[in-house]
């Protein structure tokens, strides 16, 4: 196999809590005000990273954000010492404090859109940080995400970092959660599939219940920034019915790897036309497109959302087959589990293995295996240019495990966010983490 896909997972932050901040994300809303366990959440995510690294998959780590975000509270009129600001925010606007304490950066599928060098005109890997302007708590992640990505992929000979698109709803961008790439070998040209929920300038169908967070205009802008060939680019609209059913990002209804697209019957608007366009553009590249479409009569959209069947990772093994990495919730859902057992038993199917991970702490906030990782396709030279301190191995796993066990609380509720001691704990831990991952001073409190 030429080239490879690296997955960079987000470490769960120390303020991981359940506040129901994400309208359209059913798990987030349904678990509002539950007591969280940040330590368990971080260890669950870390265990997945280590397990996949042990199986030979390239696995990296991206850091959490500094939260509660005191600079934002200051910008919004709260004055005094950090302790005074936390007290005032908790007293006068506890919802705002919760939003500015969110650990949602763990879901690095929303960190950026990434295009490999094989698809870009300048033959470099392109990153565009997502503006995430549909949700206040996520829109504040841009600066630190940019700094973390630049510290991880620093060599300008190989990597290009674009600033986020304008902070306006016309260019709403949710990153790689609405982006797939299909192709053959990872270091060969492929077809990039941008998925949007609505078009600002062209109109058309839109969801009625929940917001369409990604616009066509944002996706087109990213394709231009990444210098992609229009003949190898596809823009498709997510089915509004799916969005209204709780599919807030495309990675809740579809996942791709190499030439395979694993998706629901109702993932896209005009789905047969979408699949035909992808197939034709891949054929020009001499590649055979494989669509694994899950019928609604077997798995309903509700079943898909409840189990997060499609919010999975589809990874290529050494033998050429693929493994589907799913959350424990898939095993607990009888119809979904029966389908997966049948799928992996088909000798002619590209997917012949299913791996299950317990990610319950993240799942209760609406984030499965696919949400937790940012895919970065690299060739050998580009891989050698990646910050090695961020790549998962036994030593890093052991260091991060000790770091989490030392710094993270095992219980957190909304009222704890006003505790000034928690803020001190966060700053101490993150300062240490930047040394472990060799990131430099990426946080505002470090400058």
From Swiss-Prot:
<comment type="similarity">
    <text>Belongs to the succinylarginine dihydrolase family.</text>
</comment>
<keyword id="KW-0056">Arginine metabolism</keyword>
<feature type="active site" description="Nucleophile">
    <location>
        <position position="371"/>
    </location>
</feature>
<dbReference type="GO" id="GO:0009015">
    <property type="term" value="F:N-succinylarginine dihydrolase activity"/>
</dbReference>
<comment type="pathway">
    <text>Amino-acid degradation; L-arginine degradation via AST pathway; L-glutamate and succinate from L-arginine: step 2/5.</text>
</comment>
<feature type="binding site">
    <location>
        <begin position="137"/>
        <end position="138"/>
    </location>
    <ligand>
        <name>substrate</name>
    </ligand>
</feature>
<feature type="binding site">
    <location>
        <position position="365"/>
    </location>
    <ligand>
        <name>substrate</name>
    </ligand>
</feature>
<feature type="binding site">
    <location>
        <position position="213"/>
    </location>
    <ligand>
        <name>substrate</name>
    </ligand>
</feature>
<dbReference type="Pfam" id="PF04996">
    <property type="entry name" value="AstB"/>
</dbReference>
<keyword id="KW-0378">Hydrolase</keyword>
<protein>
    <recommendedName>
        <fullName>N-succinylarginine dihydrolase</fullName>
        <ecNumber>3.5.3.23</ecNumber>
    </recommendedName>
</protein>
<comment type="function">
    <text>Catalyzes the hydrolysis of N(2)-succinylarginine into N(2)-succinylornithine, ammonia and CO(2).</text>
</comment>
<feature type="binding site">
    <location>
        <position position="251"/>
    </location>
    <ligand>
        <name>substrate</name>
    </ligand>
</feature>
<comment type="subunit">
    <text>Homodimer.</text>
</comment>
<dbReference type="GO" id="GO:0019544">
    <property type="term" value="P:arginine catabolic process to glutamate"/>
</dbReference>
<dbReference type="InterPro" id="IPR037031">
    <property type="entry name" value="AstB_sf"/>
</dbReference>
<dbReference type="InterPro" id="IPR007079">
    <property type="entry name" value="SuccinylArg_d-Hdrlase_AstB"/>
</dbReference>
<feature type="binding site">
    <location>
        <position position="110"/>
    </location>
    <ligand>
        <name>substrate</name>
    </ligand>
</feature>
<feature type="active site">
    <location>
        <position position="174"/>
    </location>
</feature>
<dbReference type="GO" id="GO:0019545">
    <property type="term" value="P:arginine catabolic process to succinate"/>
</dbReference>
<feature type="binding site">
    <location>
        <begin position="19"/>
        <end position="28"/>
    </location>
    <ligand>
        <name>substrate</name>
    </ligand>
</feature>
<feature type="active site">
    <location>
        <position position="249"/>
    </location>
</feature>
